[in-house]
Design a protein with these regions (language model features):
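N-terminal secretory signal peptides that target proteins for export/translocation
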Residues: 1-4
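Bacterial N-terminal signal peptides
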Residues: 7-18
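Electrostatic cytochrome c docking/interface patches
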Residues: 22-41, 130-159, 247-256, 265-275
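Short sequence/structural segments immediately N-terminal
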Residues: 32-43, 55, 85, 102, ...
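Sequence/structural segment immediately N-terminal to covalent heme-attachment motifs in c-type
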Residues: 32-51, 147-172, 179-183, 236
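Periodic glycine anchor positions in long extracellular repeat architectures
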Residues: 51-56, 99, 168-172, 215
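Conserved catalytic-core motifs of eukaryotic protein kinase domains, centered on the activation segment
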Residues: 53, 59-61, 176-178
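Extracytoplasmic electron-transfer domains, predominantly the class I c-type cytochrome c fold
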Residues: 62-110, 116-123, 180-245
Length: 276
């Protein structure tokens, strides 16, 4: 394969989604698309990375880190449903449209709504999970509170008690990361550097809230829905947002973070860290 062809294929990219049997909507979790047409979309835009068998072993997969998704397993990292459940069509559509920042998965916003739904329907034929399971129910997202200095302070305490084992000081340098971590596909992974102001999927405090609540499927990133209250997760989200140049992170919010005392200077988060 020539260098030009490889570059071209990388630009075309690959999808990270999933969807229902080759007869369009057959199956419990199927999207309202045509799987036959979706296969044609897949072969044009996705096969270079995700492979002819949708196994993540396309011609340019070797240059991709993380590796392209193997759709046959029915595991999708980014979902608005709780950990372990299949994603909604809207979840998959978001990944197709926006891509995954910092990876080889580019945005496919130029695809029509029908093309996106069709390719989702095709990918849902590639895993038996879609024939027996429906998508998970999206987590409830309460209205975002106005961040305050007190909330950001509490957010750091909660972060240190619940997140620092992997994320460390926010740069992904926690003790678990130092030891080495792997995902469900056996690939080495590192926790996100939250000071960069953007994650693969997350852009806003609302996105951070969803990821903290739902976790990331196929990785050691757990859900916190049974551990923290919605109020506490918002506090963590605003603290993380204050760490870097996240979308809608205001100068005031960043000042709150800058004014925090050094780690360990105050009382650590105690029993109320865990949802009662």
């Amino acid at each position: 394969m020539s260098t030009a062809a490889v570059v071209s294929a990388l630009m075309v990219g690959a999808l990270t989604l999933g969807a229902a049997p080759l007869a369009a909507q057959a199956g419990v979790g199927g999207a309202a698309g045509d799987a036959g047409r979706g296969r044609q979309v897949y072969e044009r835009y996705c096969v270079q990375c995700h492979g002819e068998r949708t196994d993540g072993a396309g011609e340019v997969a070797r240059w991709s880190q993380p590796r392209p998704r193997d759709f046959r397993q029915g595991i999708f990292k980014f979902s608005t449903a709780r950990y372990g459940f299949l994603p909604t069509t809207a979840d998959l559509d978001r990944v197709i449209q926006n891509g995954l920042y910092g990876t080889r998965m580019p945005p496919f916003a130029a695809l029509s709504t029908r093309e996106r739904r069709d390719v989702i329907a095709y990918l849902q034929t590639r895993s038996p999970r879609w024939r027996t399971e429906g998508p998970g129910t999206p987590i409830a997202i309460p209205a975002e509170p106005t961040p305050t200095r007190e909330a950001v302070t509490r957010g750091r305490e909660l972060f240190e008690a619940n997140c620092s084992k992997c994320h460390g000081d926010g740069t992904g340098n926690g003790p678990s990361a130092v030891k080495g971590m792997v995902d469900d596909w056996g690939a080495a992974i590192t926790p996100a550097n939250l000071t960069l102001g953007r994650g693969k999927w997350a852009r806003t405090a609302r996105d951070i809230y969803v990821r903290a609540m739902a976790g990331i499927n196929g990785t050691p990133m757990p859900e916190s829905a049974d551990v923290l209250t919605p109020e506490q997760v918002w506090q963590v989200a605003h603290y993380v947002q204050a760490l870097g140049g996240w979308s809608r992170s205001t100068p005031e919010l960043r000042r709150f973070a800058a004014e925090l005392p050094p780690p360990g200077a105050g009382e650590p988060a105690a029993a109320d860290t865990v949802k009662q």
